[in-house]
Amino acid sequence: MAKKGKKYADALKLVDRDTAYQAEEALELVKKTSVAKFDETVEVAVRLGVDPKKADQQIRGAVVLPHGTGKTQRVLVFAKGEKAKEAEAAGADYVGEDDLINKINQGWFDFDVIVATPDMMAQVGRLGRVLGPKGLMPNPKTGTVTFDVTKAVEEIKAGKVEYRVDKSGNIHVPIGKVSFDTPKLLENFQTIVETLHKVKPAAAKGTYVKNIAVASTMGPGIRVTTTAFAK
């Protein structure tokens, strides 16, 4: 434990907590300050100038990162007939109806994302109490309630990530692994920030992007300058 503590302390010395770095430099620091023995996930945290309590300032959606997240998502699809066949052909890990609903009710959660066709939502809706708290409930805003199951599955497998503002106005999104080259992390980072600007609520007043930070799973948070993104 002492050795790990020293590594973390040494990593902290590389970061000036009072400095907001350019995005590329911040991401390079994330890689340098990674001290874990596993390939840590790199996450971006954005503080937005919105009031999530107001319906017209809630932000939720999904975007395909150009270089993915470094993690293969296990996709479960609720569909029947031809749509079930399409989901299987697209690479879904699990496809079914009541059989999968029963498994989930019994405590099975060996999947990361759920896609459902609209005609299945009445049945899937019964899982709300189980899926809701885990953030697994399919939603049209994230493209996971759709008849185009082929596109949905392929995008998720290609690196689609969901984003959602929390009660404090923050959004946390994974943008890759510390093993990624900095340019790839930077492109994923820019994709997230650009996407958040595209979905800026008309009702949001004042500074929109208030704060940005990046960090690895076990590493320190590193501030990113918002000069280019604040408006």
Swiss-Prot record:
GO terms for biological process: regulation of translation; translation. GO terms for cellular component: large ribosomal subunit. One of its GO terms (molecular function) is tRNA binding. PROSITE patterns: RIBOSOMAL_L1. Keywords: Repressor, Ribonucleoprotein, Ribosomal protein, RNA-binding, rRNA-binding, Translation regulation, tRNA-binding. Pfam families: Ribosomal_L1 (PF00687). It comes from the Bacteria. CDD domains: Ribosomal_L1. InterPro entries: Ribosom_uL1_bac-type, Ribosomal_uL1, Ribosomal_uL1-like, Ribosomal_uL1/biogenesis, Ribosomal_uL1_3-a/b-sand, Ribosomal_uL1_CS. HAMAP family: Ribosomal_uL1_B (MF_01318_B). Binds directly to 23S rRNA. The L1 stalk is quite mobile in the ribosome, and is involved in E site tRNA release. Protein L1 is also a translational repressor protein, it controls the translation of the L11 operon by binding to its mRNA. Part of the 50S ribosomal subunit. Belongs to the universal ribosomal protein uL1 family. NCBIfam families: rplA_bact. This is Large ribosomal subunit protein uL1. It comes from Shouchella clausii (strain KSM-K16) (Alkalihalobacillus clausii).
